[in-house]
Amino acid sequence: MSKSLKALFAACALVAAGTAIADSQVVNLYSARHYSTDEELYNGFTKATGIKINRVDGDDAGIIARLKAEGQASPADVIMLVDAARLYRGEVDGLFQPIHSKLLEDAIPSNLRAQPTADGISWFGLSTRARVIVYNKAKVQPADVQNYESLADPKFKGQLCIRSGSHPYNLSLFGTVVEHMGEQKAEGWIQGMKANLARPPKGGDTDQIKAVASGECTIGVTNSYYLARMMRSGKPEDQAVVGKIGVVFPNQSSWGTHLNIAGGAVARHAKNKDNAVKFLEYLASPAAQNYFANGNNEWPAAKGVELDNPALKEMTGGKPFKSETIPITAVGKNMTKVQQMLDRAGFQ
């Protein structure tokens, strides 16, 4: 048994110790996380607690639609989504059950979870992804792309690659920029980025990284874990791409780099609530948090977790980076405004 799995089993035992064993040794999970590395996390939880995980996979939008359709008949106990705006939407639509958990509240920073109510907290971030700028080292100086505002600088006209503006990763970034800049300046920024596009938005984040390396564009935007995945790849073609690009964690001298989250919630009509809370608490444990980092190259959401991931360490020069501290709920609150701005700008 690996050292990391032993640590995970120990974490599960600690989570289980303070709670009586549920009548039903099962937890039903609806998950938008499609990462094979998560299987060891799930298996570790079951081995340590005896609680079996029944999992249904889908994307964020599909899971929310399914919960609405199932209503009170839904078997779901835990919901895991990979975007803050969708978590916010699920809360607003009454699909989650607020909970009180000292373990979760102590572990997860207040800006990475739902706003508290008298009934508890509806959802918690469990891992984070930094939205970073990549640049072609032969064509761009890092000093010229130190903040998100530079993406709209006219000197980069025809040089920016980014996936669809309406993709959740970008909607999340744009939603927090509205919070930082205000609506008028944020809309001007979106229009400036549209003017700087090297091509119509297409592909995923890995495609933007490759396009920057090839010279099709000189700057791009990606989630950090896509770059870390390529950095850890043994494929020569991936290493060739990595060798041509640099990475910037934007806005270190101002509001900090934007983080989106993958997070979890207890379903509104959970039949196995105690098991659901145990599972979320397990995922917030230091061992599980480090496993998120090693398995899918994500940053831990919990406080004070030491990383083992060499790519994440290399990406930041082995130093912590400044991330924004505004409540991640701002992403959801600003979504309608952002989509209207994108429509006015003709940003696909």
Name these PLM-found stretches.
Residues 17-19:
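N-terminal signal peptide c-region/cleavage motif recognized by signal peptidases
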Residues 23-89, 348:
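Early extracytoplasmic/lumenal segment of secretory-pathway proteins
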Residues 30-33, 119-123, 135-137, 143, ...:
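Short beta-strand->loop
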Residues 74-79, 97-133, 149, 160-161:
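A structural signal for short loop-to-beta-strand junctions that line the ligand-binding cleft
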Residues 87-95, 118-146, 174-175, 259-265:
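Periplasmic solute-binding protein
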Residues 165, 169-172, 176-250:
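Ligand-binding pocket segment of bilobal, Venus flytrap-like solute-binding proteins
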Residues 262-325:
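Mature extracytoplasmic/periplasmic domains
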Residues 308-348:
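Extracellular/periplasmic bilobal clamshell ligand-binding domains
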